[in-house]
């Protein structure tokens, strides 16, 4: 869930950049939090406006190299922290007027192609998938979790129709040999009942493992909760998602705190649900045809945003209960 997928490492292309800038209005100055710094695409564009400051976060320590380059140009207007964005509430922001918090939940192409990270089914590197500040790798998950646990991960995080068959064959094969990236791809391809010629057979399984290894569900949920706490009144929370599970979580969080659902006209106002956000759009913003032509991986991007109506820092949300079944699957990692 870190940085946008881009077609060329040399020409970084942050997805929906123009749309993000028009929403957060850095031309009027202010302090912004870029929760997924990556290659610094959003941050650099924001800092090009003179009265701005950016607090940039990224769990991938390699992002600090690009951050240092920008710090050389923008000096004290950029603060970089190598932390997970779920921890943004630990930042000392008492004297900061946070105008917007931005999340881009994709992966950059250089991360996908890095054999050390082992994120791709095309990689010949170790089955790793750790994006930084991790407790375990995909190799440990694949070689240690049982068939039922692997099936849950593949089904709920990858929406894989053949989850049970693939998990069964993984457990069968690992009793004979350690599962590597190449071996995992072979098992997946041989387990699939139907071939989808539009996408690689291993796409959904590798997505599921990336989500599991990096605990992307709880990371996103706590990131959203803490973003809502730190952003000031009239500030923006903007999130770019790349698959339906992420979008479902973001949509639910924004909607549940943007309206009073099923409120009885007989209920006292003091019992009404907190209306923390103003929801500006009903449907997500998607890339233009031009952007998709220039950057094909952006086709799956969706941008949702809300504006904070009040300066409340304590509020109730049921999002942890709503997605508890997914967090419970992440917690299977306690066995590793």
Curated annotation (Swiss-Prot):
A GO molecular function held by the record: rRNA (cytosine-N4-)-methyltransferase activity
Catalytic EC class: transferase
Location of the protein in the cell: Cytoplasm
Cellular component, GO annotation: cytoplasm
PANTHER family per the UniProt record, alphabetical: 12S RRNA N4-METHYLCYTIDINE METHYLTRANSFERASE (PTHR11265:SF0), S-ADENOSYL-METHYLTRANSFERASE MRAW (PTHR11265)
InterPro entries: RsmH, SAM-dep_MeTrfase_MraW_recog, SAM-dependent_MTases_sf
Protein family membership: Belongs to the methyltransferase superfamily. RsmH family.
Catalysed transformations (reactions): cytidine(1402) in 16S rRNA + S-adenosyl-L-methionine = N(4)-methylcytidine(1402) in 16S rRNA + S-adenosyl-L-homocysteine + H(+)
Keyword annotations from UniProtKB, A to Z: Cytoplasm, Methyltransferase, rRNA processing, S-adenosyl-L-methionine, Transferase
Annotated positions binding S-adenosyl-L-methionine: 40-42, 58, 85, 104, 111
Record flagged with keyword Cytoplasm: yes
Protein's name in the database: Ribosomal RNA small subunit methyltransferase H
Described purpose of this protein according to its UniProt entry: Specifically methylates the N4 position of cytidine in position 1402 (C1402) of 16S rRNA.
rRNA processing as UniProt keyword: yes
GO biological process terms on file: rRNA base methylation
């Amino acid at each position: 869930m870190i940085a946008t997928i881009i077609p060329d490492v040399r020409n970084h292309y942050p997805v929906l950049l123009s749309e993000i800038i028009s929403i957060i209005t850095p031309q009027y100055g202010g302090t912004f939090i870029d929760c997924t710094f990556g290659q610094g695409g959003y941050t650099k564009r924001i800092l090009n406006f003179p009265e701005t400051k950016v607090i940039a976060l990224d769990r991938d320590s390699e992002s600090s190299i690009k951050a240092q380059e920008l710090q050389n140009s923008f000096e004290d207007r950029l603060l970089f922290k190598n932390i997970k964005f779920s921890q943004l509430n630990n930042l000392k922001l008492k004297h900061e007027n946070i105008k917007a918090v931005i999340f881009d939940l994709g992966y950059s192409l250089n991360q996908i192609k890095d054999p050390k990270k082992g994120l791709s089914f095309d990689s010949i590197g170790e089955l790793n998938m750790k994006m930084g500040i991790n407790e375990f790798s995909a190799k440990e998950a694949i070689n240690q979790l049982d068939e039922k646990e692997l099936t849950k991960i593949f089904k709920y995080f990858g929406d894989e129709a053949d989850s049970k068959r693939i998990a069964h064959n993984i457990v069968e094969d690992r009793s004979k040999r350690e599962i590597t990236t190449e071996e995992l791809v072979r098992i997946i391809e041989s387990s699939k009942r139907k071939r989808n010629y539009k996408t690689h057979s291993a796409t959904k399984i590798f997505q599921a493992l990336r989500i599991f290894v990096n605990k992307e569900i709880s990371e996103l949920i706590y990131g959203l909760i803490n973003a809502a706490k730190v952003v000031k009144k009239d500030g923006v929370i903007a999130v770019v998602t790349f698959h339906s599970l992420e979008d479902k979580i973001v949509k639910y969080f924004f909607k549940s705190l943007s309206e009073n659902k099923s409120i009885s006209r007989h209920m006292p106002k003091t019992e009404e649900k907190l209306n923390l956000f103003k929801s500006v759009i009903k449907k997500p913003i998607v890339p233009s045809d031009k952007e998709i032509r220039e950057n094909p991986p952006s086709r799956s991007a969706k941008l949702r945003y809300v504006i904070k109506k009040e300066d409340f820092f304590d509020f109730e949300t049921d999002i942890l209960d709503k997605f508890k079944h997914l967090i419970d699957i992440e917690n299977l990692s306690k066995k590793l």
